[in-house]
């Protein structure tokens, strides 16, 4: 296996983050069917995570297909290194953001590739590791960084943004109608003491919205908004898509899995614009969703939407 200088399975991240990395890749068969991996092909997984999609692509492109795996999370890369070790030097792993996929691919010798996949969801491991601060169902630091070296945490935004900016952020990225009430409640709470844990924030949001109604937790949209802002997710996606198209050889395919309407809208509009410009042919006229069986086995797949397109010129 080829790895970037200094890469190892023991990154300098908190020891509690080295719990067994678990993540079930969504729409696995559909991604492979969309990309059509073949022997000798070169592929990029821009969100390699635990290596689930990557392993399937490597199997389908045996015996000599190659894959570049990119991830900003060192725990994910460590898990990918272990899972993909049997594929030896067919695999190259690099730590970085898919926002810089063009540069990372060029540096690693992956240009004019046959396929690229992005799975934009937060992994089960990240959600279920309290220290990562993604879940409102645990007492944990209000972090939410996918890259543990990133400078801004959710706690920083919650405790420092002016009320109007906080309301705008929650409305824009969480599509939360109660954003003004939530922002007001957060500001009132932080005037008494800083809001530093996930359960604190969840309780503030729940009270601001008048308690829980229905199956969806009242804090769901606020947590989504903060996670998107902390990790600059939408801007990263907008930056990455044109680079991915440039990386594809004629006939090469891109498969993008989105998990909420903001992401899916960006993907849909980009693919349509590039198709109208004659650079892409859209394979999936409508986004592919997980089967009922997959949704039952993996409830987190319910919101997944896969779009596939092929480079034509």
UniProtKB/Swiss-Prot annotation:
Major subcellular location class: cytoplasm
Residues annotated to bind S-adenosyl-L-methionine: 51-53, 71, 98, 119, 126
Top-level EC class: transferase
SUPFAM superfamilies in the record: Putative methyltransferase TM0872, insert domain, S-adenosyl-L-methionine-dependent methyltransferases
Highest taxon in the source lineage: Bacteria
Record's GO cellular component terms: cytoplasm
Alphabetical UniProt keywords: Cytoplasm, Methyltransferase, rRNA processing, S-adenosyl-L-methionine, Transferase
InterPro entries: RsmH, SAM-dep_MeTrfase_MraW_recog, SAM-dependent_MTases_sf
Enzyme Commission number(s): 2.1.1.199
Location within or outside the cell: Cytoplasm
Disordered as annotated region, ranges: 293-313
Reaction it catalyzes: cytidine(1402) in 16S rRNA + S-adenosyl-L-methionine = N(4)-methylcytidine(1402) in 16S rRNA + S-adenosyl-L-homocysteine + H(+)
Gene Ontology terms: biological process: rRNA base methylation
Pfam assignment, any one: Methyltransf_5
Entry GO MF terms: rRNA (cytosine-N4-)-methyltransferase activity
NCBIfam families from the UniProt entry: 16S rRNA (cytosine(1402)-N(4))-methyltransferase RsmH
Function: Specifically methylates the N4 position of cytidine in position 1402 (C1402) of 16S rRNA.
Family note: Belongs to the methyltransferase superfamily. RsmH family.
Protein name: Ribosomal RNA small subunit methyltransferase H
Gene: rsmH
């Amino acid at each position: 296996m080829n790895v970037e200088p200094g890469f190892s399975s023991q990154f300098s991240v908190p020891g509690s983050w080295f719990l067994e990395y678990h993540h079930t890749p969504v729409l696995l068969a559909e991604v492979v069917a969309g990309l059509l991996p073949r022997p000798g092909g070169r592929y990029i997984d821009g969100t390699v995570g635990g290596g689930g999609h990557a392993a399937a692509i490597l199997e389908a492109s045996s015996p000599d297909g190659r894959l570049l795996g990119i991830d900003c999370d060192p725990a994910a890369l460590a898990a990918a290194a272990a899972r993909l070790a049997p594929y030896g030097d067919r695999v190259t792993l690099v730590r970085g953001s898919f926002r810089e996929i063009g540069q990372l691919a060029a540096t690693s010798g992956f240009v004019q590739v046959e396929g690229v996949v992005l799975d934009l969801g937060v992994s089960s491991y990240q959600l279920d590791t309290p220290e990562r601060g993604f879940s409102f169902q645990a007492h944990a630091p209000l972090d939410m960084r996918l890259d543990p070296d990133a400078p801004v945490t959710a706690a920083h935004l919650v405790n420092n943004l002016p009320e109007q900016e906080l309301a705008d952020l929650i409305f824009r990225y969480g599509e939360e109608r109660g954003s003004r009430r939530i922002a007001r409640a957060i500001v009132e709470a932080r005037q008494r003491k800083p809001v530093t844990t996930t359960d604190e924030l969840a309780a503030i949001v729940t009270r601001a919205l008048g308690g829980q109604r229905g199956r969806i937790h009242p804090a769901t949209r606020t947590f989504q908004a903060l996670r998107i802002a902390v990790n600059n997710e939408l801007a990263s996606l907008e930056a990455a898509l044109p680079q991915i198209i440039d990386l594809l050889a004629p006939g090469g395919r891109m498969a993008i899995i989105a998990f909420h309407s903001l992401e899916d809208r960006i993907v849909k509009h980009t693919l349509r614009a590039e198709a109208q410009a004659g650079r892409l042919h859209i394979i999936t006229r409508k986004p592919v969703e997980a089967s009922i069986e997959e949704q039952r086995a993996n409830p987190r797949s319910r919101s997944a939407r896969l779009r596939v397109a092929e480079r034509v010129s």
